[in-house]
Amino acid sequence: SLQSRSIETLNLILNTMRLKDQDVVNAWELNERHYGALTGLNKDEMKKHYGEEKIHTFRRSWDNPPKPLKKTSPYHPLNIDIYKNIPKDKIPDTESLKNTYERVIPFYKKNIEPKLDENIIVSAHGNSIRSLCKYLFNLDNENISSLEIPTGNPLLIVSEKGNIKNARYLDKDRAKDLLVF
């Protein structure tokens, strides 16, 4: 991801593990989902404007994005320096989880999947990780919206010859139900 939270998290992991000189790819495709007009609002402001039920629908449904963010907003990616090298036609005004999936999975297939015989760290965000889980665990559109991705709890996925053998959260006390293997 290009977002500072994931970069700082990755640096913390690499420093803690004393891993230096690692190949690091910061890719906008792994950024958090773009919440459109909800960007910059706190939860109370969101509820006031849209209502709690609509906010839940925006946040968890597969194909229901919030209203677009105006391109003139200081929160729009077009107005943020870290996005200056991304083609403007690739920068969304809003995204659903489906849109996030359509951004994350091609990147995964091209850049991560070919390296699955190596140890890989993906430092990303709730909805980009949720999109990866949908793909990796073959979850349907209904089940993906109920999948909980706990913040700051690494998910270890063990694969062998491209097949997932095991997946578990490393902090068992804060783990959410994932899948049974």
Regions found by a protein language model. Name each.
Residues D171-F181:
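Acidic, His/Gly-rich catalytic cores of divalent-metal-dependent hydrolytic chemistry
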Residues Q3, K47, L97-I105:
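Amphipathic, non-transmembrane alpha-helical scaffold segments
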Residues N111-E118:
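Glycine-rich phosphate-binding loop signature in dinucleotide/nucleotide-binding domains
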